[in-house]
């Protein structure tokens, strides 16, 4: 039987079907997460890709022939409903154009977020709308151009983006005063980050930014008044750290009642800690550290700040003290407490009232006695404990405890006993342990092997001895950095196979190690190895060529033999130091290191000639005190080498003019060789400090630890989160040795950047001293002593305005000492002894401090320095006329002297021999004396 449906029922059914179809479409939309992007925006993205030279990595954007959905492309975010592009992440572009064309963003009219951080364009332009580019992006709320290197020229473009709520300018080259006028139209700003720029001066009235909730001005050069900040009544987070603010903290800050984060650390605020902080009822993060505060600080100021979670206080003045309040029970419960340089003698009692501390930093105080192990017992969630630079003397640990502590720093205390045997059992989760600069003794406890997660271990500068425990070598499989230097460890380094598959940095210098065992061979991850100043014997293992070292230090050991050729073929080297051993054989023909690498092969027994290509990629080349021979090669061009040290070999020939092409040289040492000929006049082309292209600093180890646990102790809402993370890197020191001011000094780090010197002493150089050397205005040390240089001291030496040491002793120089040399204000050493100089010694300036030892051996000099009067006018006139007569007469006189001496010597011997030919009593006495001497010698 057929059922009949009314028209109304049919209409309802059709409507239900339609609804179901719509629901299916919505369901399909939800399944895909978005609808396809519009074609105009897709083409706009492809134009961006072409203009920005974007490769497939790190951008997964297809080519023009692929009609894929751009909403699915990486770094592109679309609205789920409209399919319009609302977010672009254009960070880390490898080869961007010099200028960014802002008109390329016109197609993205709904854009809300634009991230151009680490983009590294030099500036912006728009040929269509000029500065009004961002005016077209009416929905743009977040703009991030951090770490770009742009300057203030981009600010007029940004000022038209009136819809902006978040603006991040961190890490650029902006300068001048606070950019209030340049950003006057950004009235909707809620977060402004100006950190890590070069802004200066006071803070203006910021009432125009009435919506601002987060302001980061850190790491600039702001100074003067900061009262303009008091207008920001809605401000919740304020970071003024690392600036140059001075004086008292403004009292008007107590009106910022909504502040949750206040960081004024690393400034020059002085006086007592501002009492206004007691009124900041909403504050959760309060950092007052690294200022010049002094006097007593009472915890009563913060006792009622019930929301406080992080409190940091320290002072560079060393005049800040914490007032003792034993009965104080604050309302806050801290997660982080830092009280550095507060002259604490005991752990403050209020800490006992805290229930869940994660970070305790009491470093740089005066804590004494036993390590406060009760902190481990009371706070099971404690993750960071910093007690370095105190005076603790005894390390005791709880017996039955398995703690979650991850960072412990006890360096620079007065511990002088053995480590607790259970240290590894108590701290099995430790990741960063620093026990350096103490007096710990005996061998390492085997329980170190329980530290499965440890990544950084510093045991340097103690009195540990013995060999490394096998349980330690096998158990600490996560170790990244191991520092054992300045102890008494002995035996072979890693005598057996280890489990250090992640070890990158091994620093074990200044111990008693005697050999390199095969256990080291398996640590292929090593990038830094320092075994200098030990007693290593034998040869460098051939398998060393399999490592990709960046830094290798084997100096001052007993190693010998030739060097493995594979050692010099790695492009990763930055420093290779094999000095102070007994290596022999020829030098390698090349050194394939990284740009600006340092090569030390000095104080060995290398022989043969110097390869001309050895200098190619080096910043410092030290070949001093070997057995190298031949001539100085015609080095290949190197515009960056700063120091060339060839002293103490047997090099012969002339000084090649090719050295004048090493324009960046700061220190050139060719002393103690057998070089002949004249000094090249073109040496004035060498920099010696006149062209400072770059400076050399301590190398930060380029190895970081990717740690999942960043030790986040407080998460900020608006400004960039600050997280606690230890420094796993450290600084590598390098040095260059050079003789100056009558002593041999080692120039390290920054001191090298201020040293410029030329040493050609103890050779066989002749001829005049080139007047062109007077062009080396920034040179600080000049040594031409112990040669056969003749002629006059150049008058141009008066131009050496930075000179500190001039040594011209033991030459054949004649004539007067130029009086203008008395204008050299920095000169400490001026030695011209044992020459043929004449005339008066300058008596003004630095010459008034010189004694007679600097002028001895010059019979015709006079002056107060040698207590010889110059009042005899006839003598003075004679000396002056003699000086003007030229070199020829002086040369003839010297020849007559030498010929006369030789003739006298020859005539004396001939007379003696003729005398013996005649029979006489004297002849018989002489031969009797000779016979008696021979008999006596035979008896002996």
Swiss-Prot record:
InterPro entries: Leu-rich_rpt, Leu-rich_rpt_typical-subtyp, LRR_dom_sf, LRR_N_plant-typ, RLP_Defense_Trigger. SUPFAM superfamilies: L domain-like, RNI-like. Residues 1-28 form the signal peptide. Belongs to the RLP family. LRR repeats lie at residues 108-136, 137-163, 165-185, 186-211, 213-232, 233-255, 257-279, 281-304, 306-330, 331-354, 355-378, 379-402, 403-426, 427-450, 452-475, 477-502, 503-522, 523-546, 547-570, 571-593, 595-615, 616-639, 641-662, 663-686, 752-776, 777-799, 801-824, 826-849. PANTHER family: RECEPTOR-LIKE PROTEIN 14, RECEPTOR-LIKE PROTEIN 9A-RELATED. This is Receptor-like protein 9b. It comes from Arabidopsis thaliana. Residues 917-940 are cytoplasmic. Glycans are attached at residues 53, 63, 66, 101, 115, 151, 270, 304, 361, 389, 402, 434, 463, 685, 783, 799, 831, 836, 867, 873. The chain crosses the membrane at residues 896-916. Residues 29-895 are extracellular. Keywords: Cell membrane, Glycoprotein, Leucine-rich repeat, Membrane, Receptor, Repeat, Signal, Transmembrane, Transmembrane helix. It is found in: Cell membrane. Its main location: membrane. GO terms for cellular component: plasma membrane.
């Amino acid at each position: 039987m057929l059922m009949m449906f009314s028209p109304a029922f049919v209409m309802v059914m059709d409507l239900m079907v339609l609804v179901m179809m719509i629901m299916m479409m919505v369901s399909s939309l939800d399944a895909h997460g978005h609808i396809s992007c519009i074609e105009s925006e897709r083409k706009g993205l492809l134009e961006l890709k072409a203009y920005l030279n974007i490769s497939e990595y790190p951008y997964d954007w297809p080519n023009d022939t692929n009609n894929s959905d751009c909403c699915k492309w990486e770094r592109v975010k679309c609205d789920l409903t409209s399919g319009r592009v609302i977010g672009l992440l254009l960070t880390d572009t490898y080869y961007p154009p010099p200028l960014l064309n802002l008109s390329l963003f016109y197609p993205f009219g709904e854009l809300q977020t634009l991230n151009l951080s680490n983009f590294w364009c030099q500036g912006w332009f728009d040929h269509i709308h000029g500065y009004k580019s961002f005016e077209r992006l009416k929905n743009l709320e977040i703009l991030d151009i951090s770490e770009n290197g742009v300057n203030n020229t981009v600010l007029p473009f940004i000022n038209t983006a009136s819809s902006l709520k978040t603006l991040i300018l961190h890490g650029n080259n902006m300068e001048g005063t606070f950019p209030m006028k340049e950003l006057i139209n950004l009235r909707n700003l809620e977060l402004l980050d100006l950190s890590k720029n070069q802004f200066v001066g006071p803070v203006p009235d910021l009432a125009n930014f009435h919506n601002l909730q987060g302001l980061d001005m850190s790491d600039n050069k702001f100074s003067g008044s900061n009262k303009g900040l008091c207008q920001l009544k809605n401000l919740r987070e304020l970071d003024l750290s690392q600036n140059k603010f001075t004086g008292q903290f403004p009292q008007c800050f107590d009106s910022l009642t909504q502040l949750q984060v206040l960081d004024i650390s690393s400034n020059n605020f002085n006086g007592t800690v501002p009492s206004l902080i007691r009124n900041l009822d909403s504050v959760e993060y309060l950092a007052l550290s690294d200022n010049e505060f002094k006097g007593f600080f009472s915890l009563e100021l913060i006792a009622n700040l019930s929301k406080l979670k992080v409190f940091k206080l320290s002072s560079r003045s060393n005049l800040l003290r914490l007032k003792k309040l034993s009965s104080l029970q604050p309302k806050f419960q801290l997660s982080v407490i830092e009280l550095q340089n507060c002259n604490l003698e005991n752990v403050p009692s209020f800490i006992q009232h805290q229930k869940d501390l994660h970070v305790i930093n009491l470093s740089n105080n005066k804590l004494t006695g036993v390590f406060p192990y009760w902190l481990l017992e009371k706070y099971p969630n404690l993750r960071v404990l910093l007690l370095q630079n105190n005076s603790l003397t005894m390390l005791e640990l709880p017996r039955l405890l398995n703690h979650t502590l991850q960072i412990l720093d006890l360096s620079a205390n007065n511990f002088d006993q053995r480590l607790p045997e259970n240290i590894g059992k108590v701290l099995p989760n430790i990741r960063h342990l620093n026990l350096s600069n103490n007096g710990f003794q005996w061998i390492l406890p085997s329980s170190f092997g329980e530290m499965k997660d440890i990544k950084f271990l510093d045991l340097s500068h103690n009195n540990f001895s013995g060999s490394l425990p096998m349980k330690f070598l096998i158990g600490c499989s996560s170790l990244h950095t191991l520092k054992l230097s300045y102890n008494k460890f002995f035996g072979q380094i890693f005598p057996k196979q280890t489990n250090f598959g992640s070890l990158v940095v091994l620093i074990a210098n200044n111990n008693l190690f005697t050999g390199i065992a095969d256990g080291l061979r398996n640590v292929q991850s090593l990038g830094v190895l320092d075994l200098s100043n030990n007693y290593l014997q034998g040869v460098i293992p051939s398998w060393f060529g399999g490592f990709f070292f960046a830094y290798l230090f084997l100096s001052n050991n007993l190693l010998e033999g030739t060097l493995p050729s594979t050692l010099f073929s790695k492009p990763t080297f930055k420093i290779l130091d094999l000095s102070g051993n007994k290596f022999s054989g020829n030098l390698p023909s090349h050194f394939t290191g990284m740009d600006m690498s340092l090569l030390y092969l000095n104080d060995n027994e290398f022989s043969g000639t110097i390869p001309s290509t050895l200098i190619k990629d080096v910043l410092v080349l030290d070949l001093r005190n070997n057995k190298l021979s031949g001539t100085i090669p015609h080095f290949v061009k190197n515009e960056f080498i700063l120091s060339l040290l060839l002293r103490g070999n047997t090099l012969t020939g002339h000084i090649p003019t090719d050295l004048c092409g090493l324009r960046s040289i700061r220190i050139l040492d060719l002393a103690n060789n057998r070089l002949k000929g004249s000094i090249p006049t073109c040496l004035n082309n060498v920099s010696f400090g006149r062209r400072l292209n770059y400076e050399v600093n301590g190398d930060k180890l380029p190895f970081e630890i990717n740690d999942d646990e960043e030790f986040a102790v407080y998460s900020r809402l608006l400004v960039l989160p600050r997280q606690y993370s230890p420094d796993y890197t450290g600084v590598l020191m390098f040095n260059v040795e050079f003789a100056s001011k009558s002593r041999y000094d080692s120039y390290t780090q920054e001191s090298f950047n201020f040293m410029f010197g030329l040493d050609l002493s103890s050779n066989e150089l002749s001829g005049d001293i080139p007047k062109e050397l007077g062009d080396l205005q920034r040179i600080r040390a000049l040594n031409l002593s112990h040669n056969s240089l003749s002629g006059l001291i150049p008058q141009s030496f008066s131009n050496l305005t930075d000179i500190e040491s001039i040594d011209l002793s033991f030459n054949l120089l004649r004539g007067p000492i130029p009086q203008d040399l008395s204008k050299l204000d920095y000169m400490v050493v001026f030695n011209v002894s044992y020459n043929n100089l004449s005339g008066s010694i300058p008596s003004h300036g630095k010459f008034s401090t010189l004694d007679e030892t600097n002028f001895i051996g010059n019979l015709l000099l006079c002056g107060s320095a040698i207590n010889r009067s110059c009042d005899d006018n006839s003598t003075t006139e004679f000396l002056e006329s003699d000086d003007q007569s030229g070199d020829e007469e002086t040369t003839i006189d010297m020849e007559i002297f030498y010929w006369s001496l030789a003739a006298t010597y020859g005539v004396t011997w001939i007379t003696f021999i003729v005398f013996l030919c005649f029979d006489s009593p004297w002849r018989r006495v002489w031969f009797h004396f000779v016979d008696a001497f021979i008999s006596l010698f035979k008896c002996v």
